[in-house]
Amino acid sequence: MTPELAHDLKASVRTIPDYPKPGIMFRDITTLMGDPRSFRRAVDELVQPWAGSKIDKVAGIEARGFIIGGAIAHQVSSGFVPIRKKGKLPHTCVSMEYTLEYGTDHIEIHVDAITPGERVILVDDLIATGGTAEGAIKLLRQIGAEVVAACFIIDLPDLGGAAKVRSMGVPVRTLVEFGGH
């Protein structure tokens, strides 16, 4: 990725101070997604390392991972699989508890969403501490997926999430970094 593209993508992300609580700088990608050129460039850049590779499914983490993941699935001609909060999927699910900054939560996937051995890219808008991504990778592996990569538009490297995912043996692709929380 060129420095100019990285600059343009970073500039297209809106920062909202003190949301959802004081001291947090919320990185809002809806402005990036609302700009057709920025959105296309971000999706193209995220999938570039896997262009021409066999990718069976793209798994997106609720909610912004659905938007980005759907676009990536279209780009690589694969299926899309939603990973949702507990109780939001209508069919038989497999659930995984994961760690948040303050406590735990659960995510789910349909038990038949992945055929064992399928190659899957995990997608979300942002990686911070990596707790949700770690839970999603464990969940995908539990139902037989080979997680070939995890892609995020934004990395908050001070929080260590990308390093956590890499320590699980999953390559990480991010486009822009922001310091702090």
Curated annotation (Swiss-Prot):
Disulfide bonds: none annotated. Pathway: Purine metabolism; AMP biosynthesis via salvage pathway; AMP from adenine: step 1/1. GO terms for biological process: adenine salvage; AMP salvage; purine ribonucleoside salvage. SUPFAM superfamilies: PRTase-like. Belongs to the purine/pyrimidine phosphoribosyltransferase family. This is Adenine phosphoribosyltransferase. Its main location: cytoplasm. It is found in: Cytoplasm. InterPro entries: Ade_phspho_trans, Adenine_PRTase, PRibTrfase_dom, PRTase-like. The keyword Transferase applies. Keywords: Cytoplasm, Glycosyltransferase, Purine salvage, Transferase. It holds the Pfam family Pribosyltran.
